[in-house]
Regions:
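Low-complexity, glycine/serine/proline-rich disordered segments
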Residues: 1-63, 181-197
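Hydrophobic, Leu/Ile/Phe/Ala-enriched alpha-helical segments that form helix-helix packing faces
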Residues: 39-43, 54, 112-116, 158-165
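Exposed beta-strand and adjacent loop surfaces of beta-rich binding modules
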Residues: 51, 129, 169
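Short HxH-centered metal-ligating active-site micro-motif
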Residues: 85-139
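Active-site or metal-binding loop neighborhoods of secreted/extracellular toxin and effector enzymes
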Residues: 123-125, 133-197
Length: 197
């Protein structure tokens, strides 16, 4: 069996206080804003949106912070455009116009796919939660959400990622600013191509 030789910990042996750098505890509500602040500082992008970060509890990937930026953010940071950097990426926007493609969520999704592949995990072995936080107070745009509420629409990047890993729960949250109208969705959970919460 694949688990042969592995030590199995009893529940009382597990240190529930210890968390790895990338693991998100349910009560840790500041991880997203904190990671966005660090990313803004690292990339030298103090105000422009959209940036996105994600963390997971999947064994072997829990120490990774997945990072992404919109085309405007990547340009301001002096980073290559996604179409230049990763033209053959696994997850691509279903948007038909340039402004509806290469969003921060797609950037994060592709970093996650690359990490899964590097870890040698099959799509079915990807079990757990991916917490994604994005900086735009308007919420995740309709193009990135495409197909989640209507299977007749083309699949956006969130649905593509979710269907690729059917055992992965994707919990998305967004920066919220009083007075800013939400035009997409701010906080939601997706699994296997559908909203679950």
């Amino acid at each position: 069996t694949p688990d042969a030789g592995k030590k199995v910990q009893k529940p009382e042996e597990v240190d529930t206080e210890a968390t790895k750098a990338g693991k998100v505890e349910e009560e840790d509500t500041n991880w997203g804003p904190d990671e966005i602040s660090r990313l803004r500082e690292d990339w030298g992008v103090p105000e422009t949106d959209t940036l996105a970060v994600a963390k997971t509890d999947i064994e072997g990937l829990e120490d990774i912070v997945f990072k992404g930026g919109s085309p405007r953010v990547r340009k301001e940071a002096g980073l290559d455009d996604l179409d230049v950097l990763k033209p053959d990426r696994a997850i691509k926007s279903s948007g038909k116009i340039a402004s509806a493609t290469r969003h921060a969520e797609a950037d994060v999704a592709n970093e996650f796919v690359e990490a899964v592949e590097k870890a040698g995990l099959s799509n079915e072995e990807v079990k757990g939660v991916l917490h994604l936080y994005q900086s735009n107070p308007s919420g995740v745009c309709p193009t990135c959400l495409s197909g989640l509420g209507n299977p007749d629409k083309a699949s956006g990047v969130i649905k593509q990622l979710s269907e690729r890993y059917p055992n992965l729960k994707i919990k998305v949250s967004s920066n919220q600013v009083e007075g800013v109208r939400v035009t997409g969705r701010s906080n939601f959970t997706v699994q296997n191509g559908k909203y679950v919460d």
